[in-house]
């Protein structure tokens, strides 16, 4: 028994020794920083811009719709803390042509200075049964949600490396941590951001550039309202188990995590559990974070199995109900 205890203590000390070189990054000062937000004309992106503006940042809003950009600019400007702050609007499709994205980022840097933080929030959502989703929609999801983040990141990264500082944020989704019924087109495009972020963080860490992946739950945004119009019943019932968050709350947490240089940004108990369960080989920025993942993994996996059982039960019930309705229609 004593040998087991001794072995445990030795292993624990060795673990602390291996993790000890990990030092939390120095927080980014938003006051006077240049923050670029793609998808900044509405929803989470607009709220992130507002949150950064409250802390004195200069903002570049990037989106396709010029009218929405103008409206968003007016809303963001209400949160100014000094008369020097500026909100710049740029209309471009970040998923269409890299050369255009590179050009507008260059314009933004010429007007407001080098980009200190890039928030990749441009995205779209689509739900539906796999065989009912048009093939072109699978391509569209990857173009908008994945390449729409690759292009702006590629456009700012060289300058960030030269300055040896910066923050890159990817706004994923809890559907980018777990594949759910109805998200066969959407989930893969969000899962892809995690792989990009992990590889990019390993490349950028020596340059004092930190990457954050945010996994917000269902959030009350125009995009979410549009998605609900075509969402399968199974997807609605599963999603309802976690509720709907407000974009202002999401923005506050995301900005805080990005400023601190945290790799993962999660929301609420379910989000924390999902992030711990899916941590894999993702980087940590503190000893505490790593130890929490180690200690909670077994418990969270047990809880997750109950969740999965509940989700499978929902899918089976919906299938049975549909079959019963079809049978009743035939009898009539």
Swiss-Prot record:
Motif (GXSXG): 39-43
SUPFAM superfamilies noted in UniProt: NAD(P)-binding Rossmann-fold domains (SSF51735)
Cellular component terms per the entry's GO annotation: endoplasmic reticulum membrane
Signal peptide location: 1-25
One GO BP: 3-keto-sphinganine metabolic process
Keywords in alphabetical order: Endoplasmic reticulum, Lipid metabolism, NADP, Oxidoreductase, Signal, Sphingolipid metabolism
Catalysis performed (reactions): sphinganine + NADP(+) = 3-oxosphinganine + NADPH + H(+)
Gene3D superfamilies, sorted: NAD(P)-binding Rossmann-like Domain
Any one GO MF annotation of this record: 3-dehydrosphinganine reductase activity
The protein's annotated pathway: Lipid metabolism; sphingolipid metabolism
UniProt key word DNA-binding: no
CDD domains: KDSR-like_SDR_c
Chain sites annotated for binding NADPH: 39, 41-43, 64-65, 68, 93
Family recorded in the similarity comment: Belongs to the short-chain dehydrogenases/reductases (SDR) family.
Protein name: 3-dehydrosphinganine reductase
């Amino acid at each position: 028994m004593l040998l087991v205890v001794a072995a445990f203590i030795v292993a624990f000390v060795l673990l602390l020794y291996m993790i000890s070189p990990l030092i939390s990054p120095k927080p980014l000062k938003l006051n006077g920083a240049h923050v670029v937000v793609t998808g900044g004309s509405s929803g989470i992106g607009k709220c992130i811009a507002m949150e950064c503006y409250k802390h004195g940042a200069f903002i570049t809003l990037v989106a396709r719709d010029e009218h929405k950009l103008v409206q968003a600019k007016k809303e963001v400007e209400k949160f100014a803390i000094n008369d020097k702050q500026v909100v710049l609007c740029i209309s471009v499709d970040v998923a269409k042509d890299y050369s255009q994205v590179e050009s507008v980022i260059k314009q933004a840097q010429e007007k407001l200075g080098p980009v200190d933080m890039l928030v990749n929030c441009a995205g779209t959502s689509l739900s539906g049964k796999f065989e009912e989703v048009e093939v072109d929609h699978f391509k569209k999801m990857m173009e908008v949600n994945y390449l729409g983040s690759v292009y702006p990141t590629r456009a700012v990264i060289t300058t960030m490396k030269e300055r040896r500082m910066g923050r890159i944020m990817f706004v994923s989704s809890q559907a980018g941590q777990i594949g759910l019924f109805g998200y066969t087109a959407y989930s893969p495009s969000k899962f892809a951001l995690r792989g990009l972020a992990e590889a990019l963080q390993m490349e950028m860490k020596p340059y004092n550039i930190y990457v954050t992946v945010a996994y917000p739950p269902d959030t009350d945004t125009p995009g979410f309202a549009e998605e609900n119009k075509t969402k399968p019943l199974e997807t609605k019932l599963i999603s309802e188990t976690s509720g709907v968050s407000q974009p202002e709350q999401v923005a506050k947490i995301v900005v805080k995590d990005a400023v601190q240089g945290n790799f993962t940004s999660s929301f609420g108990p379910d989000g924390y559990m999902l992030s711990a369960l899916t941590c894999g080989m993702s980087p940590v920025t503190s000893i505490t974070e790593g130890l929490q993942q180690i200690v909670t993994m077994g418990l969270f996996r047990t809880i997750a199995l109950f969740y999965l059982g509940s989700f499978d039960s929902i899918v089976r019930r919906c299938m049975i109900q549909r079959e019963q309705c079809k049978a009743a229609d035939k009898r009539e």
